């Protein structure tokens, strides 16, 4: 049975810079957007806000939905990745709460697009999607019957 990993990611932008999280995987420091898996009993928007806080210490809500990517990782793991935009008025300090995150960095789009240490090609693709200017209302991915009604199934 096909069971893709459902993940969320946040393109966080402030003062012309983008927020990336740095984590060490197999001895190499890699950049990613604040991102992670959808957990039971949370919406996609809630998951995005939670992952942002866990990985950066920033408490903010997504303002827009950007895109959903269907991706097969090199190890053949399938992903459905929901990408959100978060615009902050100014660059703010970060304090990761997730021990997997080494640090956070505010960098330019050019630095991300030219980086050789991206966790996946979706990191650069997310910046390109953000730069395209396409934004969708969060209601586009509305919740049905939320919270789940007990005894329905």
From Swiss-Prot:
GO terms for molecular function: nucleoside diphosphate phosphatase activity; ribonucleoside triphosphate phosphatase activity; thiamine diphosphate phosphatase activity. Its EC number is 3.6.1.-. Pfam families: NUDIX (PF00293). Its cofactor is Mg(2+). A motif (Nudix box) lies at residues 36-57. It is an enzyme of class 3 (hydrolase). InterPro entries: Nudix_hydrolase, NUDIX_hydrolase-like_dom_sf, NUDIX_hydrolase_CS, NUDIX_hydrolase_dom, NudJ. Residues 3-131 form the Nudix hydrolase domain. The keyword Hydrolase applies. Keywords: Hydrolase, Magnesium. Monomer. Belongs to the Nudix hydrolase family. NudJ subfamily. This is Phosphatase NudJ. It comes from Shigella sonnei (strain Ss046). The gene is nudJ.
């Amino acid at each position: 049975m096909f069971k893709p990993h459902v993940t969320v990611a946040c393109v966080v932008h402030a003062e012309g810079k983008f927020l990336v999280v740095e984590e060490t995987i197999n001895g190499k420091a890699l950049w990613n957007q604040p991102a992670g898996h959808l957990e039971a009993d949370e919406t996609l928007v809630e998951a995005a806000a939670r992952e942002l806080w866990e990985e950066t210490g920033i408490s903010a809500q997504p303002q827009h939905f950007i895109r959903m990517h269907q991706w097969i990782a090199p190890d053949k793991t399938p992903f459905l990745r929901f990408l959100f935009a978060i615009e902050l008025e100014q660059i703010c300090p970060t304090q990761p709460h997730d021990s997997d995150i080494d640090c956070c960095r505010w960098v330019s789009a050019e630095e991300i697009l030219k980086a050789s240490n991206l966790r996946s090609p979706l990191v650069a693709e997310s910046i390109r999607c953000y730069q395209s200017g396409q934004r969708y209302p969060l209601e586009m991915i509305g919740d049905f019957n939320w919270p789940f009604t007990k005894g329905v199934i």
